[in-house]
Amino acid sequence: MVATKSVLSAVALAGVAAAETIDVMVGQGGLKFVPDNIKAKAGDEVVFHFVMGHHDVTLGRYDSPCMPIQGESIWSGVVDTVEKGKGVTFTVPIHDDKTKWIYCSVAKHCQNGMSLVINEPSSGDNQADYKDRAKIVPQSGSPTQVKGGTLGGSGGSGGSSSSSASSSGSSSGTTSAPTPTGGHSSSHPSSTSGSDSSNTQSTPDATLIPSGSIPSATGSGSHSSTPTASPGAAAGLKGSAVLAGVVALGAWIGLL
């Protein structure tokens, strides 16, 4: 019994070790899957790396180029590498050795040759014939839900740069505006509602003064330039001046 378990474990480990990861570049060099003809067995994974442009990975039928298989779909959804950034992947696990026809359903990409075959038959159905018949398909089709694989890589941020300006339409006077890439710099924030904060020059940080510490006005239309000293404070100042004079006189006499 123990020997049987050991044999089964060894077989299982051998199967795991034999599994391969096959990398395919999507959009590299144009409307292409690179490579576009691969072999994969049960247990392998095909990782599609979106390199450039707007593309998707769709499982289709040989007899209906550029059209998806209903009920047995593989679809990555359309990936925009311009917005999401490079590094987005779609990993498809392979469960059998059947032939699979993959294409890009975006616009006329399939019609222009953007397709791939996994486990192409040694005779009969072939990729060259698939691409020829795809040229006359009026419009490509795709599923409506991501299925058959897992999206990963760096596309989770959605492509938004953390340094991009707010789209609220108004700039805040309490935050430093970003340095503009062109045009004239401005040392004053714009007072126009809806102004773009990206057009203002970065200003030095200001120290905020509590409103209670600002001296009150001494008369209509004017503010006191200096606060009024209290009698006690004035007496203290005079005493300090007399003491300083005595110290200075003593020092002078000592020099004599």
UniProtKB/Swiss-Prot annotation:
Keyword flag Lipoprotein: yes
GO CC terms of this entry: extracellular region; plasma membrane; side of membrane
Localization per Swiss-Prot or TrEMBL: Cell membrane; Secreted
Entry superkingdom: Eukaryota
Compositional bias ranges of the Gly residues kind: 149-159
Propeptide, chain numbering: 234-256
Keyword annotations of the record: Cell membrane, Glycoprotein, GPI-anchor, Lipoprotein, Membrane, Secreted, Signal
Signal peptide range in chain numbering: 1-19
InterPro entries xref list: Cupredoxin, Ser-rich/MCO-related
Residue positions bearing lipid (GPI-anchor amidated alanine): A233
UniProt feature, compositional bias: Low complexity: 160-204, 215-235
Membrane topology: Lipid-anchor; GPI-anchor
Gene3D superfamilies per UniProt: Cupredoxins - blue copper proteins
Main location: membrane
Region named Disordered: 135-235
Name of the protein this chain belongs to: Extracellular serine-rich protein ARB_03024
Source organism (scientific name): Arthroderma benhamiae (strain ATCC MYA-4681 / CBS 112371) (Trichophyton mentagrophytes)
